[in-house]
Every structure is written in C-alpha cells, then in structure tokens.
Amino acid sequence: ATEDGKIYNSDNEEPTVLRSTAYISAQKDPDKLVGFTRQNDVLLAFGEWTTEQFYDAAVASPASFMGRLDQGTLQVGCAAPDSIVHQEKNVFWVGSSKTGGFTVQMLDGVSNVQRVSTDSIDKVLNAEKTSITSANAYPLRVAGHFYYVLTLSASNRTFVYDIDEDRWTEWQSGSSGRFKYVSSDEHDDGAIVLHESDGTICTFDITVYQDNGSPIYCILQTAPIDRDTQHNKTCKRFELYGDEQTSSATVDIQYSDDNYKTFSTARTVDMQYRSWLTGLGKYRRRAWKCTHTANTPLRLEGFEEEFQEGAH
C-alpha cells in the first residue's frame, strides 16, 4: 500500500506476481493511508480520520479483485499504525477523527464501532500530541481474559484494557515507567512476550506473581474520602478484606491527608489471616494506598473503616 491510498494485490494464488494495474484506492476522504488489517471477510484500510472497507468482488485480473464496501466507511481513522490489533472477532486501535482528539476504538464485526477508552485514558492519549504516532499495542490472552496492551512513548506508560471486564489498568516493569515488553505470541497454549531491549522471552504463568524474578507492584489507591462531611474524623480501625491466602501475603497500607503530597509510613497487614490496623489519627479528607509486592496471589474485595466524626 502507498500513503496516497493505493492498495495493491498479487495475482490469485500467485503471491510473487504484482501488477501496476492491480490496485484499488482508498479515496472516500482525502486523508493519508495509515495502515490496514483484515476483519472477517473484509480488508480495513485506516486513513487519518476515516476507515474504508474492501471485499473480494471477484474482479478479473489485471485489475484489483477488490471492491469498496461503500456503506461500511467508518468516520474514525487511526493515529498510530502500530496500535492496530486484531483479536478474534474484534479490532482495536488508537483512533482519530476530524473533530480532534485521540481515543481507543473497538470494532465488533464490520459496523459496530465504539469507543472503549475512558475520559482519563483519553486525557493521557491527547497529552502525547504528535508522539501518539509511535504508540504500540499487542494482544494477550491470559487466564481466560483478553487484554489490549497499549504503550505510549512520550509519557512512558502502558495501559491495558480487559475486554471481558471492560476495565483499564496500568502496567509497569518495576516501580515506575512502562511495561517493557513490546510484542506477544502463543507457545504451548500460553502467552509469551518479548522484552524491548535484551530479547528476553517470558511466559505468563498465573501461578507466579513476579516479573522475571523481580517484584510486581500491585498498587490500589483511592480518591480522597470525606464521608460526606468536612468535620474531623478519628480513624479507629482499618481492615482490608478479600481472599484468605494459604501462606503469608502481606500488604502495605499508607494514607495521605494532603491530596497525595505526602503519605504515612507504611504499616502491614497479612491476608493469610484476618488483620487490621488501629491508631490511625484524624483527618478531614483521606486517600488510602495499598501496595502488594509479595510472590503470592492477591484478590481484594474492599476495605472497612471504623471512624468517629468530630464536632468541627
């Protein structure tokens, strides 16, 4: 394919035979061709702000065998060619349109296109500005869940969409920065990923809770909580609850009373037993932060806080 929209094809059953006349043009809008992929029985041609669809029209050689599916043109294009991911029945990509801004789009079938990014994700995407063109994505299927793994170069962050849960999370290698694996494949019925610089190939093992021997930082952080009043609150007890583990599975608990500027010294609870913290001081608005780095499973349901409201 060429940037001006020409999509060439080889002769039928002759992949090495290319003819200068065997092409069809993506020309519904005057945007540049960015990339393409296959979805069901159509070819998706992504422009800067539109996406056209082509099908096998059985046109005889030397012309292109393809025909345009006119009613299938989507009014959203692609901002980053390496963000295009085909997963079974869906296609994901970082979209752009004439109205401006970047979003993550999902195409189900050939006509049901929808935005799956949240306002928070869109804010980070738009902060990339022209660097959005270098965004990279790949698919993962682990433990029955499909993930769209999207890395942004300018912000040095990786965001992951779980299609089954309709939920976004952020992945890192170590305690900060992006997830440093750039592509995925399948091997022995499991997912494998390739490291961006040293060529290490790792497998996803749902019984191992480390990143190639290093801790995985699982961090849960709440928004500031005021209990619907600006009165002082005395926190008497804080308890996490979730799955009870068969071995020690510690979680560090911290809190911030100044909008994340500073956090308290970490104190530890163990999910092997029912345990809680006491003597947690006073606050008007408090954000909680829970950090798990042990090589153990963790599944939390929530937390319980016992507090006493003051008069002022």
Go through each PLM region and give its residues.
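Beta-propeller and closely related beta-pinwheel folds
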Residues: T2-N136
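Beta-sheet repeat architectures centered on beta-propellers
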Residues: T73-V91, S96-H312
